[in-house]
Amino acid sequence: MVRVYAPASSANMSVGFDVLGAAVTPIDGSLLGDVVGVEAADSFSLQNLGRFASKLPSKPRENIVYQCWERFCQELGKQIPVAMTLEKNMPIGSGLGSSACSVVAALVAMNEYCGKPLNDTRLLAIMGELEGRISGSIHYDNVAPCFLGGMQLMIEENGIISQQVPGFDEWLWVLAYPGIKVSTAEARAILPAQYRRQDCIAHGRHLAGFIHACYSRQPLLAAKLMKDVIAEPYRERLLPGFSQARQAVAEIGAVASGISGSGPTLFALCDKPDTAQRVAEWLAKNYLQNQEGFVHICRLDTAGARVLE
């Protein structure tokens, strides 16, 4: 049996709408992501396990893991009889790349099981295609970091889908999922069709400055440039308590904060462990809305998707 783990990811990172994403892993060693298992069988089957399995579609053909298997078989031009298991540990509609976790884990597991017939670029292209079935448009800002690890910048030119941007070891990512669901499609529909020139200029300045600060090793400058004029001003209304939480974490000492993906998860960047702990405690007490909510203190996951022994 092949078992593959795919980590959670935080897309957009305020400054890079649809073009930046980071894979994350809890500092306590726990796994925040999905696991897909593949083993030989006489015919295809799919079993759903894990904390959030009950939230998955009841019809197997609507399950994205089934669609990954179907698409992988199509790519190879043959049916591959396997028994697949999805351990759904990620909440759906959380802003933590839940669908990307399932897509990446499923496709990497199938590729490993079949002896790696597809290279990383082809795999990533198929991942983006399948992610697009859920969110409504092909985009790679969750699947690329989830698959490849680290902080990824979407290029989509010259045969290159994404490339890694150097992160900062001292950054701690406090991720607070309040326990409610925000549909990616709904969060995209709320955005304007056109933007003011001054917002386009500000967005370009922030993103270019952020990438420059990452390469020139200026962590505080990079954090200060993590501002969003494209999505967050419009999406805040979908997230109860977000603006108050953002103000509170800044007062505690977070160097940046924003919406993870399309929400409702909030991310807060801290450069000191004690600050991260205080931010996590405040968010656990004030931002979570039900028993399904959680807070994790994370670092960048530089490994990406990996086979579990």
UniProtKB/Swiss-Prot annotation:
Gene Ontology molecular function terms on file: ATP binding; homoserine kinase activity
Family according to the record: Belongs to the GHMP kinase family. Homoserine kinase subfamily.
Main location: cytoplasm
Purpose of the protein: Catalyzes the ATP-dependent phosphorylation of L-homoserine to L-homoserine phosphate.
EC number of the protein: 2.7.1.39
Annotated metabolic or biological route of this protein: Amino-acid biosynthesis; L-threonine biosynthesis; L-threonine from L-aspartate: step 4/5
Example GO biological process: threonine biosynthetic process
GO CC, any one term: cytoplasm
Encoding gene, per UniProt annotation: thrB
Any Pfam family hit: GHMP_kinases_N
Subcellular location: Cytoplasm
Protein name: Homoserine kinase
